[in-house]
Amino acid sequence: FTNFYANSFRTDRGLVAILSGYPAQPTTSIMKYPEKTDGLPSIPRSLKNAGYSLEYYYGGDADFTNMRSYLVSSGIEKIISETDFPLSERQGKWGAPDHTLFQRFLKDLKEEKQQEPFFKIVQTSSSHEPFEVPFYRLDDKVLNAFAYADSCVGDFVRQYKETPMWKNTLIVLVPDHLGAYPRPAENPLEGHTIPLILIGG
């Protein structure tokens, strides 16, 4: 989809927009107000009511900006985050890098008995400032971080295709907020365009 727009400039707003359809607010995030997020509709809660198991994977701190509280209230049953990775694997500002996150995610998919149907969220962090990643292919630090994120997603998809789960899986790739570069002055909407990609077996 090429006509898709970010609802925010921060994860604490973008995640709520994606999962609950709640528009981002300019000065604060509803994620910080559990008494309000408890009443929001959510994709995870609807899927839970339909019998899906729900998990969330993130290499960083799931309590950052009250994210854990929101995820639990929205229906997420299991959260894998920074403290579930050895200290040696938490190399950057945002915790475990994306390739480590996807390795853990794929390992769990293969080794743990999966309750089906399932809905799993993997939140990456490498395409976020300070753009320090274990990947050195491009001179531009920001573009290099995005190339690293792409390679991690690509590696995961290639490996996941080899599993029997692939044929019944829909993968949705979507950023939670707009990118790092300044918005073009002549067409500010261009700065809010984000990809939405659907792939599967």
Feature locations, PLM:
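Solvent-exposed soluble domains appended to multi-pass membrane proteins
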Residues: 1-201
